[in-house]
Amino acid sequence: NNKFESSNFIEWDWLSKERLNIDAKKIDSVIFFPKPSSMDEKGYINGFINSSKNIYRELCNLPINRFISISSTRVYNKQDNKTAHESDEISAEEYRGKIIREYEEQQESFYGKKLIILRLSGLYDSSLNKMSKNFIHRKNAALAIKFFIEKDFNFTDCEIFNCSEDSANSSISNKKIKSLGFSFQQYN
């Protein structure tokens, strides 16, 4: 469903040259879900780096309470069998992981302590099989976003959370988000 009925919802093409017209006294949450414009390096740069610069240009003078940036566990270089944690040093070797990490750093410089980064594992829904050992159902991704919109944690710095469901083969830790009280639901 591409329709969202709400007077408090704004949709905008973040690669557009059009200016975003917002007259707001307070914005509780902005959720940015970047998407590559194509699957090559240029598409990733457009979808992550250029689009987030455009959004920042439009929002930098607005009173935003929290900015939720959707990211990916692709930033982890998973050549070993160790479990990846949010505090691990990032050493992405392929262009997608490097660009996504650059995007995260850019977002942190833009939004500072207002920023929450959610690193999603491979998205699936009920019509798709879980295709990797690290995954998250689309509904759990939406629930994680909702969790951070509804809770007021008052973080003192940018916070990053891995969003990956429990599985016997998972190499991505989800302990940090679960320690705040988030529960992953089970979907077929």
Task: List each model region and its residues.
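Conserved Rossmann-fold cofactor-binding substructure of NAD(P)-dependent oxidoreductases
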Residues: 5-29
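NAD(P)-cofactor binding segment of oxidoreductase domains
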Residues: 27-30, 37-68
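Conserved Rossmann-fold NAD(P)-dependent oxidoreductase catalytic core, especially the SDR/UDP-sugar
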Residues: 54-93
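Conserved beta-loop-beta element that borders a ligand/cofactor-binding pocket
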Residues: 72, 103-126
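Flexible, glycine-rich beta-alpha linker
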Residues: 77-80, 91, 95, 116-132
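Substrate-positioning beta->alpha
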Residues: 99, 116-117, 128-150
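A recurrent short beta-strand within the Rossmann-like NAD(P)-dependent oxidoreductase core
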Residues: 145-148, 152-169, 173-175
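C-terminal amphipathic/interface module of NAD(P)-dependent oxidoreductases
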Residues: 171-188
